[in-house]
């Protein structure tokens, strides 16, 4: 059997080695730390975080990094034109004109409920919780929440999910507006009151 003093020395040596390695790791983590670009975090914060990949990047953070490096700010389909305006304001650039930009076809997922087996795989895949349902029960897509990312299609074992085009109506139409052309609202009632009071004062002075 080993002497207790030897065991104690071994434990002390192991603790000292662990402390030394811990100190070295802490030192190098600070010394070799790579500072992240703050603009990337700011862009990433306003992206929808759906991680849908429709922009051509594997997630929102890589797309934020690409924007910071000069890529187009119009590639986020779920964010739409309002997001483009926010990113343009953050980057201090002009809002890109949408006249010559192809508008992506808006689609949402549709579950054929007669084929659904209630496996919940599409629910787990949906990044925006747009699918409702429980285990071994039919699932349904909440169209207003669906971003059309198609991430729910591949996991479905019965191929009961179809991407359908959204019919354009005043509610679903992608209203692409230029914020510089917004006309401010004027309170005409107050304006009329001031004109009446002003004309009344003029009449009194003339009398």
UniProtKB/Swiss-Prot annotation:
Binding site for [4Fe-4S] cluster 1: 52, 55, 60, 76
Entry EC no(s): 7.-.-.-
UniProt GO MF annotations: 4 iron, 4 sulfur cluster binding; electron transfer activity; metal ion binding
Positions with a binding annotation for [4Fe-4S] cluster 3: 126, 146, 149, 152
Cell cycle recorded as keyword: no
Source organism superkingdom: Bacteria
InterPro entries: 4Fe-4S_dom, 4Fe4S_Fe-S-bd, 4Fe4S_Fe_S_CS, Elect_transpt_cplx_RnfB/RsxB, RnfB/RsxB_Proteobac, RnfB_subfamily
Domain 4Fe-4S ferredoxin-type: 107-136, 137-166
Residue ranges constituting the 4Fe-4S domain according to the UniProt record: 35-93
Main location: membrane
Binding, [4Fe-4S] cluster 2: 116, 119, 122, 156
Positions of region (Hydrophobic): 1-29
Details of cofactor binding: Binds 3 [4Fe-4S] clusters.
Pfam families, alphabetized: Fer4_21, FeS
Cofactors that this protein relies on: [4Fe-4S] cluster
HAMAP family to which the protein is assigned, alphabetical: RsxB_RnfB (MF_00463)
Free-text function comment from the UniProt entry: Part of a membrane-bound complex that couples electron transfer with translocation of ions across the membrane.
Description of how the protein assembles with itself and partners: The complex is composed of six subunits: RnfA, RnfB, RnfC, RnfD, RnfE and RnfG.
Record protein name field: Ion-translocating oxidoreductase complex subunit B
Gene: rnfB
